[in-house]
Curated annotation (Swiss-Prot):
Its cofactor is Mg(2+); S-adenosyl-L-methionine. Keywords: ATP-binding, DNA-binding, Endonuclease, Helicase, Hydrolase, Nuclease, Nucleotide-binding, Plasmid, Restriction system, S-adenosyl-L-methionine. This is Type III restriction-modification enzyme EcoP15I Res subunit. Belongs to the type III restriction-modification system Res protein family. Pfam families: RE_endonuc (PF19778), ResIII (PF04851). A heterotetramer with stoichiometry Res(2)Mod(2). A heterotrimer with stoichiometry Res(1)Mod(2). The lineage of its organism: Bacteria, Pseudomonadati, Pseudomonadota, Gammaproteobacteria, Enterobacterales. It catalyses: Endonucleolytic cleavage of DNA to give specific double-stranded fragments with terminal 5'-phosphates. AMP binds at residues 91, 122, 126, 226. Transmembrane segments: none annotated. The keyword Lyase does not apply.
Length: 970
């Protein structure tokens, strides 16, 4: 199990957000303050003329396709806005921006402002994590030093008052030591605290400042605001933020409720869903059948009593309730709901809902049966998903989050019949025991046994009142939920169900939340996107690596009062989009996009039309600013608006399926059974010495990949130039490097051996043989192990069939069920259309010999194969579904071809073809890894051909499938 998340570098959507901010400061120059006492403690001031600032923002907006309008731009404001949808990594994006601002301009002090304690906890954990430190260390040679402002106990009357320690340390931290970037984290509650404006007995910055806010202002901070919609301008918190007099305020969020100041980058919800940067969403809506149309309205109040009117089946009744009374008095369906607070205009219920006079609730949404059904369904679906994800390799541990308002029923429900906790544990035990009857997977069986043995260990909760609770068990639960994601996701930890009121509704998230169940409506105006955001991130596997090679879905459970949840969410997603980027040139990608939807157009005809309509010029550039808009109007089917169908749907919508022409399957069956045989790759390395030679070659060729473990001194010299203090760095030579290993040689060998499955003795011998070139004892760290693993896997792939040969061993045994067949080997009537392709051509029918009734494809080349030019000799052909056939290749990778053809020759013989489509001009255009994978496929089908002949061919962009098959016929 990994001890930290594996962070990915240079993800395009995150890099674009960083670049957008950095390009705002093109031509900016840093200047140190004249105040000698502050000079080494404050940020340099970035000097940028108003005109340059304006031009930079205009250029960045143009590059990112953002309209340069008054809605997106205010040249007088020092606020820069970055809009990124929930779950796409905005925290990582602003942290990388911090590193880049430091690297480019020496900005060394940042204040991160967050709205809530839960968000603060998550942010601080990430900032202090070893994974983050290691991730940025190579590129920047810097580390973050994090200071957290916490609430203080009041000092006694005769006690000397001291400034908050975090602020003191942050302000007084010297920039002379360039190793550290200083980051102060503070939540909105502390921003408004007196502790920031009080005068203290001890001052800062050579006793020039006795109040924290003045001292913070003096260091000329850069401020980063997380969740800007929680900091409305004109309110007290924003006014206090402005007192810091930041050089620039950079706001990161998915929601900007008051609009933008200077919007430089936006990753919309549409982008996030369409580009598979987040999970899709299935909503499970619990409907009431029968008497569900009841309405309980809050009609009036004198401040002491509230009057409610029940309207059910056209019968009206009035009820008066005082503070503390249960609403079960008004309707038998209501449970665990009381009137908590009351004035003349507002009634506050115990679940946090505020009712204004005239507003109402549906009593049946508080019915215990409804809540029980939702909880039972969520538990059942969790175990179905868990069985799938924990019996695969690598494993993924799913979590389920419950939002409840019956806190007592959860916290105090032990051994109380009918309590929320008791019922939940009964549901879990029932599902776990049922699975144990048949489970064969050893790991998952043990996991289920631990569940049954200690049922209380599978769940935990976090509620706002827990912050004052001293119970050790509760503290452990909170620590896992708020502070230690890795521990919560550990396969050794059976906890996978989390309960909260609404405390975790915003800011908190965990990538492995696959289900969110709202047992009670929150009554909140929080956006639907914010609510689902707790589970939108793509999951990580047991090694803490993000899993991106398949589509995942977040299941969201709501009751019938939110029956329009999906419609509202889709509307919100699409309304959150903004003007798309306008390209300057008609690209090959745009051409393929249009031709995919208008297959009757040839490439030449399309280009002629665009030229004649004066949309493009001789060089394929768009002729004017309206040309792209005219292009979209001319070919609307190629430019769909909004989120793709199916990315957000009701669970009852079902997945799109396409019908198989079952009668044709018998002709394909022999080939289908052949290619579905399991195969094991065999490295034909004949001796230990031969493997030693290969691994040694890799190590010698990849020396530059490794980073030494140790301390390297860099000397920063301060000098005077034009009456201004400046600094320059002098990099010391290698003699100044002090080795500092993070693990022993033995630990390194153990870890590396387990990671790449090579014997200790082999590794030790190689390291001894190459010690004159690279002394591995200088590189004893986890980063070296990771680089050896990834590098050696790629090295094996790239050098297969070159430095060593390969073979395949076919494994006999049952292959069914498959993507095309059931457990008995009989053909399925239909398959998931997404397994055949993400694009659909409704304009053309597939060829008669095609296995399916509809055309689903992934590239124009595939579409042509399916719809164009019937080949007389072809008996049947089919797209090979995604992930149905995984050919093992060297280095632990897999490979999947695209088409299967059965051909009948003039002599009456049957020939089998497997086709790989590559939408490039020739083999020369392929990357080395792709070439090697194709060679692996060729080797496998050569092996299969010893019993039944199977021809493997690669089809390039200009290859006609007819000619390709014809050339292989005898």
């Amino acid at each position: 199990m990994s001890k930290g998340f594996t962070l990915e570098k240079n993800l395009p959507h995150q890099k674009a957000g960083v670049d957008a901010v950095m390009n705002v400061f093109v031509s900016a120059t840093p200047h140190l303050t004249d105040n000698v006492a502050v000079r080494l403690l404050a940020n340099p001031e970035l000097k940028l003329s108003e005109q340059q600032y304006y031009n930079n923002i205009k250029n960045v907006q143009a590059f990112n396709g953002i309209a340069h309008s008054k809605d997106n731009h205010n040249a007088k404001s020092n606020i820069i806005d970055v809009s990124m949808e929930t779950g796409t990594g905005k925290t990582y994006t602003y942290i990388k921006t911090i590193f880049d601002l430091n690297k480019s301009f020496g900005i060394n002090k940042f204040i991160i402002i967050v709205p809530t304690l839960s968000i603060k906890a998550g942010t601080v954990n990430f900032l202090k994590s070893d994974a983050l430190k290691e991730h940025f260390r190579d590129d920047y040679k810097r580390e973050l030093r994090t200071y957290v402002v916490e609430s203080q106990k009041n000092a006694g009357k005769n006690t000397k008052s001291y400034m908050p320690q975090a602020i003191h340390d942050f302000v007084e931290a010297s920039n002379f030591n360039k190793k550290y970037i200083h980051v102060l984290v503070i939540n909105s509650g502390m921003i408004n605290s007196k502790s920031l404006t009080d005068t203290y007995d001890t001052g800062l910055l050579d006793n020039q400042f006795n109040t924290p806010v003045d001292a913070l202002r003096a260091v000329k901070p850069f401020i980063i605001i997380d969740e800007p919609h929680r900091f409305p301008t004109g309110k007290k918190t924003w006014e206090n933020i402005e007192k810091f007099n930041a050089q620039y305020i950079i706001r990161y969020g998915a929601t900007f409720s008051e609009g933008y100041k200077n919007l430089v980058y936006r990753l919309t919800a549409v982008d996030a869903f369409n580009d598979d940067l987040v999970k899709g969403i299935d909503a499970y809506i619990e409907d009431i059948v029968g008497d569900g149309n009841a309405n309980l309205k809050f009609v009036k109040s004198d401040g002491k009593e509230a009057t409610f009117e029940l309207n059910e089946n056209n019968n009206k009744k009035s009820f008066k309730l005082a503070k503390g009374e249960s609403l079960s008095k008004t309707h038998s369906a209501i449970h665990d709901l009381t009137l908590d607070a009351l004035n003349k205009s507002t009634a506050v219920l115990s679940n946090g809902i505020e009712l204004k006079i005239g507003s109402s609730i549906n009593p049946y949404s508080y019915d215990q049966t409804l809540a029980d059904n939702m909880m039972r369904k969520a538990v059942k679906e969790h175990f179905k998903l868990e069985k799938e994800l924990l019996t695969q390799r690598p494993r993924i541990k799913p979590l389920t989050l419950f939002f409840i308002d019956d806190i007592e029923g959860y916290r105090d429900g032990n051994d109380i019949s009918g309590s929320l906790k008791t019922k939940f544990e009964e549901y879990v035990l029932a599902e776990a025991n049922e699975l144990l009857k048949t489970e064969q997977d050893a790991f998952y069986k043990n996991y289920l046994e631990k569940t049954v043995t200690n049922i209380s260990s599978v769940h935990g909760g976090y509620f706002s009142k827990d912050n004052s609770d001293k119970d050790d068990k509760i503290e452990q639960e909170i620590n896992e939920i708020l502070h230690d994601k890795e521990l919560l996701l550990s396969l050794d930890n059976p906890r996978r169900f989390i309960f909260s009121k609404w405390t975790l509704r915003e800011g908190w998230d965990n990538p492995n939340v696959f289900q969110i169940c709202k047992l009670r409506s929150s009554g909140s105006t929080t956006s639907k996107l914010q609510e689902v955001g707790r589970g939108l991130r793509l999951p990580v596997n047991e090694y803490m690596c993000r899993v991106k090679d398949r589509n995942f879905t977040l299941k969201y459970y709501v009751d019938f009062t939110e029956k329009d949840f999906v419609d509202s969410l889709v509307k919100e997603v699409n309304e959150s989009s903004f003007k798309e980027r306008v390209p300057s040139k008609f690209t090959q990608e745009l051409k393929e996009q249009i031709m995919a939807q208008y297959p009757e157009l040839s490439s030449r005809a399309l280009m002629n039309e665009l030229f004649n309509d004066e949309i493009i010029d001789d060089n394929d550039n768009f002729k004017d600013s309206d040309a792209y808009s005219r292009l979209k109007s001319k070919y609307p089917a190629a430019f769909p608006i909004g989120v793709k169908p199916g990315k957000i749907k009701k669970a009852t919508d079902g997945k799109r399926r396409t019908k198989m022409r079952v009668g044709k399957f018998s002709e394909l069956k022999e080939l289908w059974d052949l290619i579905n045989q399991k195969a094991v790759i065999e490295y034909k390395i004949n001796s230990e010495s031969e493997f030693l030679s290969i691994f040694k070659s890799f190590m010698l060729e990849e020396t530059e990949r490794f980073t030494k473990s140790g301390v390297h001194t860099r000397i920063d010299k301060i000098y005077i130039h034009n009456d201004m203090a400046m600094s320059k760095s002098i990099v010391s030579d290698d003699d100044d490097f002090a080795k500092l290993n993070t693990m022993s040689y033995r630990e390194f060998l153990d870890n590396l051996s387990q990671t790449i499955f090579v014997k200790h003795g082999t590794l030790h011998k190689v390291f001894c043989d190459i010690k004159d070139t690279i002394n591995i004892t200088e590189y004893l760290n986890i980063q070296t192990i990771r680089k050896i693993k990834s590098g050696f896997s790629k090295y094996l792939l790239n050098n297969s069939f070159n430095k060593f040969s390969l073979g395949y061993n076919l494994i006999s045994g049952s292959i069914h069920p498959t993507k095309f067949t059931n457990a008995d080997g009989n053909p399925l009537g239909e398959v998931l259309s997404s397994d055949l392709g993400v694009l659909q051509d409704n304009a053309k029918a597939p060829l008669d010999t095609y296995l399916f009734e509809e055309v689903f494809y992934d590239s124009e080349l595939e579409r042509r194969n399916i719809t164009d030019r019937e080949i007389q000799s072809v008996v049947v052909f089919s797209k090979i579904p995604k992930n149905s056939i995984k050919i093992p290749v060297a280095g632990g990778y897999t490979y999947s071809p695209d088409f299967a053809y059965v051909v009948k020759t003039a002599e009456g013989d049957y020939l089998n073809f497997i086709i790989e489509t590559k939408n490039v001009d020739s083999k020369d255009s392929l990357r080395l890894e792709e070439k090697r994978k194709i060679e692996h496929a060729q080797a496998l089908f050569n092996q299969i051909s010893q019993s039944v002949k199977v021809e493997f061919r690669t089809q390039f962009a200009n290859d006609d499938i007819y000619q390709l098959i014809k050339s292989a016929l005898p």
